[in-house]
Amino acid sequence: MKASDVRALTADQLKEELAKLKKEQFNLRFQKATGQLEKSSRINEVRKDIARVKTIARQKAAEVKA
């Protein structure tokens, strides 16, 4: 997911996206623990996507306050 795509989302959509990514991260960790994970690089992708969503959500919240 690109940062420009994330910036286009509303605050509610960002919350939904964050919840979806956290759920995916949980499932990937579970697959890794049980040895079923095929694409281990997806864990890092999801982790960075979560960081992007959180960063942009925080920036949008700061813009509203300012």
Swiss-Prot record:
Gene: rpmC
Family: Belongs to the universal ribosomal protein uL29 family.
Assigned keywords, A-Z: Ribonucleoprotein, Ribosomal protein
Organism: Rhizobium etli (strain ATCC 51251 / DSM 11541 / JCM 21823 / NBRC 15573 / CFN 42)
Disulphide bond pairs: none
Short name of one Pfam family: Ribosomal_L29
One GO location term (cellular component): cytosolic large ribosomal subunit
Listed PROSITE patterns: RIBOSOMAL_L29 (PS00579)
InterPro entries, sorted: Ribosomal_protein_uL29, Ribosomal_uL29, Ribosomal_uL29_CS, Ribosomal_uL29_sf
Molecular functions (GO terms): structural constituent of ribosome
Leader peptide range in chain numbering: none
Name by which UniProt lists this protein: Large ribosomal subunit protein uL29
Keyword tRNA-binding: no
Gene Ontology biological-process annotations: translation
UniProt-listed Gene3D superfamilies: 1.10.287.310
Presence of the UniProt keyword Ribosomal protein in the record: yes
Alphabetized HAMAP family for the sequence: Ribosomal_uL29 (MF_00374)
PANTHER family per UniProt: 60S RIBOSOMAL PROTEIN L35/50S RIBOSOMAL PROTEIN L29 (PTHR10916), LARGE RIBOSOMAL SUBUNIT PROTEIN UL29C (PTHR10916:SF0)
NCBIfam families in alphabetical order: L29 (TIGR00012)
